Swiss-Prot record:
Stretches for region Disordered: 132-184
Modification note: Methylation of glutamine in the GGQ triplet by HEMK1.
Protein name: Mitochondrial translation release factor in rescue
GO cellular component: mitochondrion
Transit peptide: 1-98
Location of the motif GGQ: 74-76
Family membership noted in the UniProt record: Belongs to the prokaryotic/mitochondrial release factor family.
Quaternary context: Interacts (via C-terminus) with MTRES1 (via S4 domain). Associates with mitoribosomal S39 large subunit, peptidyl tRNA and nascent chain.
Length: 184
């Protein structure tokens, strides 16, 4: 059975499979935080980001690229190799550091995507698709918070009504002389 027919059995859209499949099989990717000038974000946060066709293209002559030694978890293999990419957009002064994978090529691609988004936000501001998505995510978060608050208030009201009805039932039973263990 070919790998193509195996994926067909899962009935997932092909673009989703390409995004989510990797070295270790299918995995869910969480939505990353959005990037704005001055806002710090690790490259791990931007792993599953959508591609925006309307972003400003990067001119390779305006970029300075360096490869430095990595850091963090992974032990000596990570700390000895120079697979961490530092990419600088000279005109804007934006610097991106990417050490998400052990592969230099993958880190270069990820760094360019992140830099392209940051440069687009830097030059286009509120008109940038990245900025628009950030605003939409904030709106959805506010709506979820509002719904959760309303649900909590309804639950509190229901609890108060239950307690009030139990108190009335107990008072009525006390007035009728029925022992508490024999109430309905």
């Amino acid at each position: 059975m070919s790998s193509r027919s195996t994926w067909a059995l899962l009935r997932l859209p092909l673009p989703l499979i390409r995004i989510c499949s990797g070295k270790w099989g299918l995995r869910l990717q969480e939505k990353p935080a959005l990037l704005f000038p001055g806002m710090a974000a690790s490259t791990v946060q931007v792993a599953g980001r959508k591609d925006y066709p309307a972003l400003l293209p990067l001119n390779e002559s305006e970029l300075e690229e360096q490869f430095v030694k990595g850091h963090g978890p992974g032990g000596q293999a990570t700390n000895k190799t120079s697979n961490c990419v530092v990419l600088k957009h000279v005109p804007s002064g934006i610097v991106v550091k990417c050490h998400q994978t052990r592969s230099v090529d993958q880190n270069r691609k990820i760094a360019r995507k992140v830099l392209q988004e940051k440069v687009d936000v830097f030059y286009n501001g509120e008109n940038s698709p990245v900025h628009k998505e950030k605003l939409e995510a904030e709106r959805r978060k506010r709506e979820r918070k509002k719904r959760a608050k309303e649900t909590l208030e309804k639950k509190k009201l229901l609890k108060e009504l239950r307690e009030a009805s139990q108190n009335i039932t107990e008072k009525k039973a006390d007035a009728d002389g029925i022992p508490r263990g024999f109430q309905e």
